[in-house]
């Protein structure tokens, strides 16, 4: 019985990154022996055990054979005769197929250390094509390690394209697709995830609403990058610089889906694209079972981002209506999410990444003024029933109007 540290812990140590989780591989043992040593079995599909003291995971070495479609269409053979090399052979990337024994010696039969040196995400074997989930995993690793200079090896990208054409991606469950997407959104370079999927043909299969944006032109006056797909990913990058909040990043990703529905004769203009995108966002979120808070913010951003961009031209009554619609009185963090996504939208344009966005401070100030209106004072003044809400609305509008008038007076003649 031999025990090895494997996978991400070894890889991250070699990259000089913080190690979060440790996974161990056990070679030359059986479930019966593990149980006799006090380990507790937790794996249903293959033998995984928890250490009796530290509760870390220990998996028996195994061989997998393709038996059906999708990422779970495999049979598992875990026995005491499976070697370290055989277990590492089934792993996705060479950088994830390095093991460290109890003496600290590295075992690297497939060249993972060389690929770390050369910053390559490379498949271990041709069996890579048997698991469609690996397309998403490699794209996620490309996003995660982009800042370190990693790229997908040419031959690995070819295999990813092969999987995309095979129909295997359609067998992935919504939960697994969203899980990988959400983990990619949490990286420092989330846009790279979608760039890699587009490059191998998987974007069209798994995220057709985003794929449809590529090739859709926008007015060059406002969008030097012209292409809506490019703008979307540039905006996502800007969102990642502004916030770690994944709901805001997701809302930024889907804020312009409606532009794919603009009539060809009206291009490059996109009248009402925010509202046209609402059914597409709902469809996207329902298909992939996106969390409700992500969906709700995404719908708000799509519906209102043009209004926020035009904030200085909006009437006070329109602003109060916007605050009502966004439920900002109860959930002020939603206003922050909306404004952050709008900033990312404005800065997600080639050459305009440093653009100022005074609309955000203006909207925030208007909201704070409206929020200062006290309901208790309205009740004390004798208003009852529906008149309370009407007076509250009137005073909120008045507060914003007075502020707007003060700004006009400050302007030079």
Swiss-Prot record:
Family matches, as InterPro entries: CCA_bact (IPR012006), HD_domain (IPR006674), NT_sf (IPR043519), PolA_pol_head_dom (IPR002646), PolyA_RNA-bd (IPR032828), tRNA_CCA-adding_enzyme (IPR050124)
Binding site for ATP: 8, 11, 91, 137, 140
Domain free text: Comprises two domains: an N-terminal domain containing the nucleotidyltransferase activity and a C-terminal HD domain associated with both phosphodiesterase and phosphatase activities.
GO molecular function: ATP binding; CCA tRNA nucleotidyltransferase activity; cyclic-nucleotide phosphodiesterase activity; magnesium ion binding; phosphatase activity; tRNA binding
PANTHER family named among the record's database cross-references: MULTIFUNCTIONAL CCA PROTEIN
Miscellaneous comment: A single active site specifically recognizes both ATP and CTP and is responsible for their addition.
Family the entry assigns: Belongs to the tRNA nucleotidyltransferase/poly(A) polymerase family. Bacterial CCA-adding enzyme type 1 subfamily.
CDD domains in the cross-refs: NT_ClassII-CCAase (cd05398)
Keywords, ordered alphabetically: ATP-binding, Hydrolase, Magnesium, Metal-binding, Multifunctional enzyme, Nickel, Nucleotide-binding, Nucleotidyltransferase, RNA repair, RNA-binding, Transferase, tRNA processing
A Pfam short name: PolyA_pol
Domain HD, first and last residues per copy: 228-329
Function: Catalyzes the addition and repair of the essential 3'-terminal CCA sequence in tRNAs without using a nucleic acid template. Adds these three nucleotides in the order of C, C, and A to the tRNA nucleotide-73, using CTP and ATP as substrates and producing inorganic pyrophosphate. tRNA 3'-terminal CCA addition is required both for tRNA processing and repair. Also involved in tRNA surveillance by mediating tandem CCA addition to generate a CCACCA at the 3' terminus of unstable tRNAs. While stable tRNAs receive only 3'-terminal CCA, unstable tRNAs are marked with CCACCA and rapidly degraded.
Protein name as catalogued: Multifunctional CCA protein
Organism lineage string: Bacteria, Pseudomonadati, Pseudomonadota, Gammaproteobacteria, Alteromonadales
Reactions this protein catalyses: a tRNA precursor + 2 CTP + ATP = a tRNA with a 3' CCA end + 3 diphosphate; a tRNA with a 3' CCA end + 2 CTP + ATP = a tRNA with a 3' CCACCA end + 3 diphosphate
Organism: Shewanella denitrificans (strain OS217 / ATCC BAA-1090 / DSM 15013)
């Amino acid at each position: 019985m031999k025990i090895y540290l494997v996978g991400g812990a070894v890889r991250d140590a070699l990259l000089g990154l913080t190690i979060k989780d440790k996974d161990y591989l056990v070679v030359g043992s059986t479930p019966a022996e593990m149980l006799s040593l006090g380990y507790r079995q937790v794996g249903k599909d293959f033998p995984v055990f928890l250490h009796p003291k530290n509760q870390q995971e220990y998996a028996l070495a195994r061989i997998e054979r393709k038996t059906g479609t999708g990422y779970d269409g495999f049979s598992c053979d875990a026995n005491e005769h499976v070697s370290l090399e055989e277990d590492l052979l089934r792993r996705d990337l060479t950088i994830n197929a390095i093991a460290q024994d109890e003496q600290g010696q590295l075992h690297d039969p497939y060249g993972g250390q060389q690929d770390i040196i050369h910053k390559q995400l490379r498949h271990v074997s041709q069996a890579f094509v048997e698991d469609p989930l690996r397309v998403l995993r490699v794209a996620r690793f490309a996003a995660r390690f982009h800042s370190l200079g990693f790229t997908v090896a040419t031959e690995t990208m070819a295999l990813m394209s092969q999987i995309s054409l095979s129909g295997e991606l359609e067998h992935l469950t919504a939960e697994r697709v969203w899980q990988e997407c959400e983990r990619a959104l949490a990286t420092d370079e989330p846009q790279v995830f979608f760039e890699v999927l587009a490059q191998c043909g998987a974007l069209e299969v798994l995220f057709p609403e985003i794929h449809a944006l590529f090739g859709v032109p926008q007015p060059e006056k406002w969008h030097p990058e012209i292409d809506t797909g490019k703008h979307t990913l540039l905006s996502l990058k800007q969102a990642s610089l502004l916030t770690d909040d994944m709901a805001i990043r997701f809302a930024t990703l889907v804020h312009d889906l409606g532009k794919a529905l603009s009539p060809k004769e009206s291009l490059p203009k996109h009248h009402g694209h925010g509202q046209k995108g609402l059914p597409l966002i709902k469809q996207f979120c329902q298909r992939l079972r996106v969390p409700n808070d992500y969906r709700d913010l995404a719908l708000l951003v799509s519906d209102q981002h043009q209004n926020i961009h035009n904030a200085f031209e909006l009437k006070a009554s329109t602003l109060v209506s916007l605050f009502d619609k966004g439920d900002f009185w109860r959930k002020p963090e939603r206003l922050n999410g909306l404004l952050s996504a709008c900033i990312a939208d404005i800065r997600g344009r080639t050459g305009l990444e440093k653009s100022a966005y005074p609309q955000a401070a203006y909207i925030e100030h208007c909201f704070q003024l409206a929020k200062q209106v006290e309901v208790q004072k309205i009740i004390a003044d004798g208003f009852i029933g529906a008149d309370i809400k009407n007076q509250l609305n009137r005073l909120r509008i008045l507060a914003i109007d007075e502020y707007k008038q003060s700004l006009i007076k400050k302007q030079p003649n």
